[in-house]
Design a protein with these regions (language model features):
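Acidic-aromatic substrate-binding/catalytic surfaces of carbohydrate-active enzymes
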Residues: 10-66
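Short Pro-Gly-centered flexible turn/kink motifs
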Residues: 13, 60-68, 271-287
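Short, structured beta-strand/loop micro-motifs enriched in basic residues and often containing a Trp
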Residues: 43-50, 258-266
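Extended, loop-rich substrate-binding clefts of extracytoplasmic carbohydrate-active enzymes
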Residues: 65-118
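Acidic, contiguous internal or C-terminal segments within carbohydrate-active enzymes
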Residues: 96-143, 148
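Active-site/ligand-binding surface loops and adjacent short beta/alpha elements
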Residues: 147, 151-229
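Glycine-rich active-site loops that engage anionic ligands at enzyme catalytic sites
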Residues: 218-259
Length: 288
């Protein structure tokens, strides 16, 4: 376990999956991250790479060959190399290996850079094409935040506040794939009240979100967090059935749709990176 801390926050990181496993505020004395209780969901904040969500039949085709990948890809299950740069920064690195090449025929370098900036935790993803052909990939975040995380509150006391005017149209999932059915969630102002039955039919998948900051707040006190993200064209909100957490998931990529032809080059949201090029995105969370 790797620990980063400053005067305001302390985070715990694991080499397996380069996963964030703890987010503690020294000021509020509160833990903001989900504890990975296996009764509900045994993860905290996995990185989704080189795909987001599920593939149709758990497989794709590329240059005439068929390959298999599990839901959300393989990065979350691999041990990353890491370097602790300072008390407030660490970098994790994963490259292709014999195992990854069986299901994903690309050469890559994936870097996750965690930094503490005052009361904020910043996570920057960087992908480098180290191969001799175009690199195709998707990437996404999946942090789970504890709800409730303060005494004398319950799940229904909490809500998500969006920083832009939203018409929350989401795509319904069908056996983990994006269906052709959408639904509209009515907001009270910029506010989505949390309730467990929001997620009884899997994640809410958004393709047209206007906000770049979502705040997790509650009606009983002033504690909460701001979750900021830039240039992620897809977003998911999810919780396991009746679980005491909510996941805020910015994605560059999305699960296959039910009518997808399984050709990787046709996959919605797939990123195409030229030889030697690099690509990056970040998200950050501020606890209060």
């Amino acid at each position: 376990m790797i620990t980063l801390e400053n005067d305001y926050i302390k985070v715990s990181l694991a080499a397996k999956g380069a996963e964030l496993q703890g987010l503690f505020s020294k000021e509020t004395k509160l833990e903001y991250l989900w504890n990975a209780n296996p009764k509900y969901w045994a993860k905290h904040s996995p990185v989704l790479f080189p795909i987001v969500g599920s593939l149709k039949n758990n497989s794709f085709t590329y240059q005439g060959k068929s390959y298999e990948l599990p839901r959300h890809g393989f990065a979350r299950d691999h041990v990353f190399n890491f370097e602790k740069i300072s008390e407030t920064e660490a970098v994790f690195t994963l490259t292709q290996n014999e195992d990854t090449l069986k299901g994903y025929p690309f050469y890559f370098e994936l870097k996750l850079r965690y930094r503490l900036i005052d009361r904020k935790l910043n996570l920057t993803y960087k992908v480098i094409n180290t191969g001799t052909a175009e690199l195709l990939f998707s990437i996404g975040a999946h942090p789970a935040f504890a709800v409730p995380n303060t005494p004398n509150t319950v799940y229904e006391d909490y809500y998500l506040a969006f920083n832009a005017d939203e018409k929350l149209t989401f795509w319904k999932l069908e056996d983990g794939l994006v269906s052709d059915q959408t639904a509209l969630i009515e907001l009270g102002g910029h506010r989505l009240n949390l309730k467990h039955d929001l997620f009884y039919n899997d994640a809410l998948v958004f393709k047209t979100l206007q906000s770049n900051c979502i705040s997790l707040l509650n009606n009983k006190n002033d504690y909460g967090l701001h979750f900021h993200f830039e240039d992620f064209p897809f977003f998911g909100i999810w919780a396991a059935t009746d679980a005491p957490f909510v996941c805020l998931e910015p994605w560059c990529g999305v699960a296959d749709d039910i009518n997808h032809d399984q050709e990787l080059t046709h996959k919605e949201g797939i990123i195409k990176l030229d030889i030697g090029e690099n690509w990056s995105r970040f998200w950050e969370v501020e606890c209060f």
